[in-house]
């Protein structure tokens, strides 16, 4: 677990912001949410495959030229 030490004369809100930033960088919250409930291996594969397809189509869409506006 990430540790954040309070510096001298540092407000609690600033330390809390630093803690939240370190948690976000380590990906702890996303892992916690994914482990909150059991997901069958087939459901996990299906979800990951759907995300890959979505990324693929998004990449294709961003590489296409915009349609001509007449």
From Swiss-Prot:
The protein, known as: Small ribosomal subunit protein bS21
Keyword terms, alphabetized: Ribonucleoprotein, Ribosomal protein
Gene3D superfamilies on file: Ribosomal protein S8
Region of interest (Disordered), ranges: 40-70
UniProt record similarity statement: Belongs to the bacterial ribosomal protein bS21 family.
UniProt xrefs under InterPro entries: Ribosomal_bS21, Ribosomal_bS21_CS, Ribosomal_bS21_sf
GO biological process: translation
Organism (species): Bordetella pertussis (strain Tohama I / ATCC BAA-589 / NCTC 13251)
Any one GO molecular function term: structural constituent of ribosome
